[in-house]
A protein has these predicted regions:
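Structural alpha/beta surface segment adjacent to cysteine/selenocysteine redox centers
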Residues: 59-135, 147-152
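Generic detector of well-ordered alpha-helical segments enriched in charged/polar residues
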Residues: 34, 106-110, 120, 140, ...
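Solvent-exposed, well-ordered amphipathic alpha-helical segments
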Residues: 54-62, 99, 108, 112-115, ...
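C-terminal cap of thioredoxin/glutaredoxin-like
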Residues: 1-16, 125-182
Length: 182
């Protein structure tokens, strides 16, 4: 079913596609299973193509694919501002079919003197990055990397164990995800 989880009864007479929720535990069991099935080997990520930002002691790690003009990425950045003791590897991934100016903005962010601060200023304060004449960026490589990893939307982030989380999450949810990974 196109890479989606399908539930069926014993003789496969009935099936459904969707989220299976454990109401007692208030957990989305489908999402948890998808995280495992779509995990990656984070040791193979080309970290030189990412903007690195360390908050606090940086003992926990997030690998984030994000588009500077994605509204959900803006929301995630607001939530990440409340998360401490984390190292963030930010892979700029402009999705130009949705956000035509995102590639230009991503290039300006990458070429900035303080990349992560410029990223935060743009997402949180709507401050346009300074125009740059030119610099070499990994943005095209990040687009190819995202395709290789089946990252088809932003934000998408990976935890230290390689498990995938698609979409924005609250600071509390991010904390729970980080605590669940040794």
């Amino acid at each position: 079913m196109g890479g989606r989880i399908v539930y069926t009864n014993e003789d496969a007479k009935y099936f459904f596609v969707g989220n299976l929720i454990d109401l007692k535990e208030q957990k989305n069991l489908t999402e948890e299973r998808e995280r495992v099935l779509t995990a990656i080997d984070v040791k193979k990520l080309p970290l030189d193509q990412a903007i690195k930002h360390v908050k606090g002691n940086g003992e926990r790690v997030l690998y984030i694919f994000s588009d500077p003009d994605c509204p959900y990425c803006h929301q995630l950045e607001k939530e990440l501002a409340q998360v401490n003791n984390v190292t963030i590897y930010l892979f700029l991934y402009p999705i130009t079919r949705l956000h035509p100016n995102a590639a230009t903005v991503a290039e300006q962010i990458w070429c900035a003197k303080d990349q992560y601060q410029t990223w935060q200023d743009y997402l949180l304060k709507k401050k346009t990055p300074a125009k740059v004449t030119s610099c070499t960026t990994p943005i095209e490589k990040n687009i190819q990397l995202a395709k290789t990893l089946d990252v088809d939307g932003t934000p998408t982030f990976f935890l230290k164990d390689g498990s995938r989380v698609s979409g924005t999450r609250s600071a509390g949810e991010i904390e729970l995800l980080l605590k669940a990974v040794p």
